[in-house]
Design a protein with these regions (language model features):
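N-terminal subdomain of lithium-sensitive/metallo-dependent phosphomonoesterases centered on the IMPase/IPPase/PAP
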Residues: 1-81, 136, 170-173, 234-236
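Oxyanion/phosphate-interacting regions
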Residues: 1-5, 11-12, 169-178, 192-262
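Residue-level signal for inorganic ion chemistry
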Residues: 10, 14, 37, 48, ...
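Glycine-rich active-site/cofactor-binding loop and its immediate structural neighborhood
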Residues: 72-111
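Acidic beta-strand-loop-alpha-helix segment within the catalytic core
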Residues: 98-193, 238, 242-262
Length: 262
C-alpha cells in the first residue's frame, strides 16, 4: 500500500505540470525531458528511500554506474514518467512505473495512470490488484485480478502508434494461424500492459528500442497472471541489471495465448 501511495503522489505532481505549459528539454540521446519527469523522480526516490534505505534504486532519471550496481541482488527500478512524448502531446497515455527486482527478475510491479486514476500492482507472491483512486487518502475501488481464461475473438494485439515494422507483420501472420482476424489496440507507454492484464488484449510485440525501466513492472504483473514477456528471438525471459540497460526486442503474451501458440 505504501508503494501505491508513492505512485499516486508522483502522479498528482505530474498532473500539476500536465495542466500547465510544458517546458521540454532533451537528454543526450535526444529523448524529451520535462520538469514533470524530474519532479516525479524526486518524489519516488525520496519516498522509496524512506520506505527502506537498504534497497538501492535505479531510475531513468537517476542513473547509476555499472560498477556500482553490477552486484545488486535486490533493487527498485523506476520510470517516473513513462511516455513523456504522450505527456507532451497531452493524450493521457503516460504512466508511473515502479518495479522491485530480485536476482535479476522482476518480482513486483506497479503501473499507475495519473490521468485515468488507475493502477495495476502486485507480483507472484501477492497476486495482482486493480486499484481505482481519487487521491492518496481515497483509493475508491480494489479488485483482485485473475488470470485471463481465454483469448479474444478476434485476437487483439496492443501496440504503439508507430508504423508496423517487418517483424511485427510476421508476428501478425503467426497470430492469424490462430485467429483469421487480428485487431489492434494502439496505446502509448506501459499502459499496453493494462490491456494485457485485463484481458482486453492478447499480445504485445515490441520490435523497437525500450529500456529496462519501461518493461519490468509490466513483466512482473503479466507473469503473475500466467503470461510471459520473452526475448523475441530466443524465447527466454528478459534479463535485468545488464551493463547496457537496453532491452532486446520482445513479445508479451497472456496465459491462454501461450497455451495456443506453444
Amino acid at each position: 500500500l505504501r508503494v501505491c501511495n508513492i505512485a499516486i503522489k508522483a502522479g498528482e505532481e505530474i498532473l500539476k505540470y500536465y495542466n500547465d505549459d510544458i517546458d521540454v528539454t532533451h537528454k543526450d540521446d535526444s529523448s524529451p525531458l520535462t520538469k514533470a519527469d524530474l519532479a516525479s523522480n524526486k518524489i519516488i526516490i525520496d519516498n522509496l528511500k524512506n520506505l527502506d534505505s537498504s534497497i538501492p534504486i535505479l531510475s531513468e532519471e537517476s542513473l547509476i554506474t555499472w560498477n556500482e550496481r553490477k552486484n545488486w541482488n535486490k533493487y527498485w527500478l523506476v520510470d517516473p514518467l513513462d511516455g513523456t512524448k504522450e505527456f507532451i502531446n497531452r493524450n493521457g497515455e503516460f504512466a508511473v512505473n515502479i518495479a522491485l527486482l530480485r536476482d535479476g527478475k522482476p518480482v513486483f510491479g506497479l503501473i499507475a495512470s495519473p490521468e485515468q486514476k488507475l493502477m495495476y500492482v502486485g507480483g507472484t507472491e501477492t497476486g495482482i490488484f486493480k486499484i481505482e483512486f481519487d487521491s492518496i487518502e481515497n483509493p475508491t475501488k480494489w479488485e483482485t485480478i485473475s488470470d485471463p481464461t481465454e483469448i479474444n475473438d478476434p485476437i487483439v494485439m496492443t501496440c504503439s502508434r508507430s508504423h508496423h515494422s517487418g517483424p511485427v507483420i510476421h508476428f501478425i501472420n503467426d497470430l492469424k494461424k490462430i485467429s483469421p482476424t487480428v485487431e489492434f489496440a494502439k496505446k502509448g507507454s506501459s499502459l499496453k500492459f493494462f490491456d494485457l492484464a485485463s484481458g482486453a488484449a492478447d499480445a504485445y510485440p515490441r520490435f523497437a528500442p525500450t529500456m529496462e525501466w519501461d518493461i519490468a513492472a509490466g513483466q512482473a504483473i503479466l507473469e503473475a497472471l500466467g503470461g510471459s514477456v520473452v526475448h523475441a528471438e530466443t524465447g527466454l525471459p528478459l534479463c535485468y541489471n545488464k551493463e547496457n540497460l537496453t532491452n532486446p526486442y520482445f513479445i508479451a503474451k497472456i496465459k491462454p495465448l501461450l497455451a495456443l501458440s506453444s
